[in-house]
Amino acid sequence: PTRRSSDLQLLDVMAGQVSDNTVVLKEVGDENKTVLEAFGLEFSPATDADIAVIKKQLGKECENLFYKAWRVENSATRKNFKTFCKGKGRIAKKLFWHGSRTENWWSILRTGLVLRPTNSVINGKMFGYGLYFAPRARKSVGYTSLRGSYWAGGHSNYGFMALYEVVYGKPYDVSDNAGLSDMNYEKLQKRAPGC
């Protein structure tokens, strides 16, 4: 993106954060609640078992980037996930990475990943609007604010990624985005029914 486009995206993020703060003040209301409690968020240190899984998923190419991990639960997104999975019989779940710029993480943690975020800088949408996950950590590192990140052009000494449990259906594997930049569910079903 051009410098002007990047500046406008950053201003949109900042405006979203100001409106988020206004919402926080309204939603917390109860002086006994923390902001995290008001938004249904629970943060806890990752257990040794969690860290072992994370390091395994990072693989040899990214294990040196690991610094610290937290377990984050958003009660609303967890409920939606369980509701979606319920009654579907046997479904496959896999762990996939999602990387994003540092300034996007409060919104992601608060609302979950959304198709068209209004107050986040979008680093790319190779296949149109969607929720993007990667099986390899290296791909997601490229979308963080970490110095040298490929897609986000990060300049920070740190970056954040999340390891998500994702319901995994019938995959549609592609090697490039030729003709797929405006992909949506209806078009996908015509091209690859059942995906």
What spans do the regions from the language model cover?
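Extended, H/D-rich, highly charged conserved domains that either
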Residues: 7-93
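Segments that shape or occlude catalytic/ligand-binding pockets
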Residues: 27-30, 41, 71, 79-195
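Short, small-residue-biased leader/transition segments that mark boundaries at the very start
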Residues: 2-5
